[in-house]
């Protein structure tokens, strides 16, 4: 199983500190450091998956639990997903297409279940376009997740399921999609990045 590169430094520091503390005989603190190193390995895991294939599908951009499925007045739909600290935290593109824009927006760090979190919290906004429309993936920071990392830039050409970024320590991902799709998930569903079908074109 691979590890997301953003976890390397944390894992190394915890292991190195633990070994140093063992050398000097500080076993209780060393055990805590080793436990944290193992937790970071688990948290930043990048498991091998088989990407769901098919025409006209929108895949889940993240692992987690669906918080809300909502149709907006302009015909767009939005699906909001909560990521706990136990979920895989890397994000994948829900569709094939071209990255049109990547925007960082500073903000607050409210907990993901706060109804205002998706509006006021710090976030990265990744806009992807293909022949079926425009799709927006929002990586949203939270009360613990204080850093959202995007791995893509405008002009990048993506295939559905490609990795696009990571959020550190639990938060929320929102996906906005154009009209013309049948939603295949509901509130409370557990979803898997690149595997679960969010919606299919009508």
PLM feature spans:
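Contiguous, well-folded functional domains in the mature portion of proteins
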Residues: 1-202
């Amino acid at each position: 199983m691979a590890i997301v590169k953003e976890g390397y430094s944390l894992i190394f520091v915890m292991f190195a500190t633990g070994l140093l503390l063992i050398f000097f005989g500080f076993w209780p603190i060393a055990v805590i450091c080793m436990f944290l190193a193992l937790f970071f390995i688990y948290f930043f895991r990048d498991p091998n998956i088989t990407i769901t294939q098919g025409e006209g599908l929108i895949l889940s951009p993240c692992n987690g639990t669906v918080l809300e499925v909502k149709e907006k007045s302009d015909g767009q739909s939005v699906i909001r997903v909560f990521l706990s600290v136990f979920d895989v935290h890397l994000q994948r593109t829900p569709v094939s297409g071209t990255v049109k824009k990547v925007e960082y927006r500073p903000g607050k760090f409210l907990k993901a279940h706060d109804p205002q979190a998706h509006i006021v919290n710090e976030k990265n906004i990744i806009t992807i376009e293909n022949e079926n429309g425009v799709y927006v993936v929002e990586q949203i920071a939270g009360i613990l997740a204080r850093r959202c990392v995007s791995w893509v830039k405008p002009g990048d050409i993506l295939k559905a399921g490609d990795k696009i970024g990571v959020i550190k320590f639990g938060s929320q991902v929102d996906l906005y999609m154009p009209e013309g799709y049948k939603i295949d998930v509901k509130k409370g569903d557990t979803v898997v990045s690149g595997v679960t079908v969010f919606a299919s074109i009508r």
